Design a protein with these regions (language model features):
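Bacterial Sec-dependent N-terminal signal peptides
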Residues: 1, 5-6, 11-13, 17, ...
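Predominantly soluble domains enriched in secretory-pathway, periplasmic, or organellar proteins
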Residues: 33-255
Length: 255
């Protein structure tokens, strides 16, 4: 959203679709060449206590994402812990990490994978593959979770116990090329999700039916979503960029 393009006679939507096709084709090609095999040289870790995991996104298409661990008791940081514990690189663009069921779930966006790791040894205990471009994971139970996507008009439903994709939630009025679902919060049986890139809404999902049942219009491109201790939702919009056919406005904060 922060890039301006010269169209050289092409319409904006034609150019955008062309760029989207190239990006998807290249990333899928790169991913197909990426090896997930374990290496021989691995280290043994035994982290205890209340540590802090740090996802280091890396450079897009460079495959240099890493994971770090900070121990407040010793005030020491261990870098490259995933590589050092497993003997393989984490992948391309570490987007987010969520802790659930005594595992760390690391979402690697441009490698189309989520790794589950042991919180003490940092070793992989499972993975979910064949995702489009995963962003965030939200757990409904030990056997059900939602995964938001970029470049897809669906939210994936997964079974964390089996590390399997079990279904999809179709987002209304969203195409594949403009697809963008981002962060999620839950209140009761409903999950709320902000739709970010070229979108201006927060959708409401019934977790019993796995369907979008309502939506709330906000400013252009809500980038994040949180819920406070009073069960009030907050979102920040980036407003798009000048010259965007979707529009541009000042960033805003909504409650």
């Amino acid at each position: 959203p922060g890039i301006n393009y010269k169209n050289n006679g092409m319409t904006y939507h034609q150019l955008k679709y062309l760029l989207w096709s190239v990006v998807v084709g290249v990333t899928l090609s790169l991913t197909s060449c990426m090896k997930w095999d374990y290496g021989d040289a691995v280290e043994d870790f035994n982290a205890t206590g209340a540590g802090l995991f740090i996802t280091n996104e890396g450079n897009f298409q460079y495959g240099n994402a890493t994971l770090s661990y900070y121990d407040p008791a010793t005030k020491q940081v261990q870098n490259e812990i995933f590589f050092r514990a497993n003997g393989m690189k984490l992948g391309d663009v570490a987007q987010s990490m969520t802790i659930h069921d005594n595992k760390g779930w690391v979402v690697v966006n441009n490698s189309h994978v989520i790794f589950a790791i042991d919180l003490n040894t940092f070793k992989e205990v499972g993975r979910i593959e064949n995702l489009t471009s995963p962003r965030y994971i939200h757990f409904l139970s030990d056997e059900k979770a939602y995964v938001t996507q970029l470049w897809d008009n669906r939210i994936f439903i997964i079974n964390p116990k089996k590390y399997e994709i079990t279904g999809y939630i179709q987002v209304p009025d969203m195409t594949m090329e403009s697809g963008s679902t981002e962060q999620m919060v839950q209140y009761g049986k409903y999950v709320y999700c902000n739709c970010w890139s070229y979108q201006n809404r927060i959708i409401k999902i019934d977790t019993e039916t796995d369907r979008v049942v309502d939506e709330l219009k906000v400013g252009i491109q809500p980038t994040s979503l949180v819920m406070d201790c009073n069960n009030k939702m907050w979102t920040i919009t980036d407003g798009g960029y000048e010259g965007s056919p979707y529009g541009y406005e000042a960033p805003s904060l909504y409650r």
